[in-house]
Amino acid sequence: MDPNCSCATGDSCTCASSCKCKECKCTSCKKSCCSCCPAGCTKCAQGCICKGASDKCSCCA
């Protein structure tokens, strides 16, 4: 269980408007809250996809 998410590893959880799920292993958070988004990114919850380097993704590049 990730302290920032209310679900067990692999389950789904809600990460709607913030980037608090950076280390979350939930499958839904992986898609909706990218670990490569910079802190404070307002677009993190819009289904961005990480591209290579840890600081680049499709919505906050």
Curated annotation (Swiss-Prot):
<keyword id="KW-0104">Cadmium</keyword>
<feature type="binding site">
    <location>
        <position position="29"/>
    </location>
    <ligand>
        <name>a divalent metal cation 3</name>
    </ligand>
</feature>
<dbReference type="GO" id="GO:0045926">
    <property type="term" value="P:negative regulation of growth"/>
</dbReference>
<feature type="binding site">
    <location>
        <position position="59"/>
    </location>
    <ligand>
        <name>a divalent metal cation 7</name>
    </ligand>
</feature>
<comment type="function">
    <text>Metallothioneins have a high content of cysteine residues that bind various heavy metals; these proteins are transcriptionally regulated by both heavy metals and glucocorticoids.</text>
</comment>
<feature type="binding site">
    <location>
        <position position="34"/>
    </location>
    <ligand>
        <name>a divalent metal cation 4</name>
    </ligand>
</feature>
<dbReference type="GO" id="GO:0008270">
    <property type="term" value="F:zinc ion binding"/>
</dbReference>
<feature type="binding site">
    <location>
        <position position="57"/>
    </location>
    <ligand>
        <name>a divalent metal cation 7</name>
    </ligand>
</feature>
<feature type="binding site">
    <location>
        <position position="60"/>
    </location>
    <ligand>
        <name>a divalent metal cation 6</name>
    </ligand>
</feature>
<feature type="binding site">
    <location>
        <position position="33"/>
    </location>
    <ligand>
        <name>a divalent metal cation 4</name>
    </ligand>
</feature>
<dbReference type="InterPro" id="IPR023587">
    <property type="entry name" value="Metalthion_dom_sf_vert"/>
</dbReference>
<feature type="binding site">
    <location>
        <position position="24"/>
    </location>
    <ligand>
        <name>a divalent metal cation 1</name>
    </ligand>
</feature>
<dbReference type="InterPro" id="IPR017854">
    <property type="entry name" value="Metalthion_dom_sf"/>
</dbReference>
<feature type="binding site">
    <location>
        <position position="37"/>
    </location>
    <ligand>
        <name>a divalent metal cation 6</name>
    </ligand>
</feature>
<feature type="binding site">
    <location>
        <position position="44"/>
    </location>
    <ligand>
        <name>a divalent metal cation 6</name>
    </ligand>
</feature>
<protein>
    <recommendedName>
        <fullName>Metallothionein-2B</fullName>
    </recommendedName>
</protein>
<feature type="binding site">
    <location>
        <position position="5"/>
    </location>
    <ligand>
        <name>a divalent metal cation 1</name>
    </ligand>
</feature>
<feature type="binding site">
    <location>
        <position position="34"/>
    </location>
    <ligand>
        <name>a divalent metal cation 5</name>
    </ligand>
</feature>
<feature type="binding site">
    <location>
        <position position="44"/>
    </location>
    <ligand>
        <name>a divalent metal cation 4</name>
    </ligand>
</feature>
<dbReference type="GO" id="GO:0006882">
    <property type="term" value="P:intracellular zinc ion homeostasis"/>
</dbReference>
<feature type="modified residue" description="N-acetylmethionine">
    <location>
        <position position="1"/>
    </location>
</feature>
<feature type="binding site">
    <location>
        <position position="37"/>
    </location>
    <ligand>
        <name>a divalent metal cation 5</name>
    </ligand>
</feature>
<comment type="similarity">
    <text>Belongs to the metallothionein superfamily. Type 1 family.</text>
</comment>
<keyword id="KW-0862">Zinc</keyword>
<dbReference type="Pfam" id="PF00131">
    <property type="entry name" value="Metallothio"/>
</dbReference>
<keyword id="KW-0479">Metal-binding</keyword>
<feature type="binding site">
    <location>
        <position position="50"/>
    </location>
    <ligand>
        <name>a divalent metal cation 7</name>
    </ligand>
</feature>
<feature type="binding site">
    <location>
        <position position="13"/>
    </location>
    <ligand>
        <name>a divalent metal cation 2</name>
    </ligand>
</feature>
<dbReference type="GO" id="GO:0071294">
    <property type="term" value="P:cellular response to zinc ion"/>
</dbReference>
<feature type="region of interest" description="Beta">
    <location>
        <begin position="1"/>
        <end position="29"/>
    </location>
</feature>
<feature type="binding site">
    <location>
        <position position="41"/>
    </location>
    <ligand>
        <name>a divalent metal cation 6</name>
    </ligand>
</feature>
<feature type="binding site">
    <location>
        <position position="60"/>
    </location>
    <ligand>
        <name>a divalent metal cation 7</name>
    </ligand>
</feature>
<dbReference type="InterPro" id="IPR018064">
    <property type="entry name" value="Metalthion_vert_metal_BS"/>
</dbReference>
<keyword id="KW-0480">Metal-thiolate cluster</keyword>
<feature type="region of interest" description="Alpha">
    <location>
        <begin position="30"/>
        <end position="61"/>
    </location>
</feature>
<dbReference type="GO" id="GO:0071276">
    <property type="term" value="P:cellular response to cadmium ion"/>
</dbReference>
<feature type="binding site">
    <location>
        <position position="50"/>
    </location>
    <ligand>
        <name>a divalent metal cation 5</name>
    </ligand>
</feature>
<keyword id="KW-0007">Acetylation</keyword>
<feature type="binding site">
    <location>
        <position position="7"/>
    </location>
    <ligand>
        <name>a divalent metal cation 2</name>
    </ligand>
</feature>
<dbReference type="GO" id="GO:0005737">
    <property type="term" value="C:cytoplasm"/>
</dbReference>
<feature type="binding site">
    <location>
        <position position="15"/>
    </location>
    <ligand>
        <name>a divalent metal cation 3</name>
    </ligand>
</feature>
<dbReference type="GO" id="GO:0010273">
    <property type="term" value="P:detoxification of copper ion"/>
</dbReference>
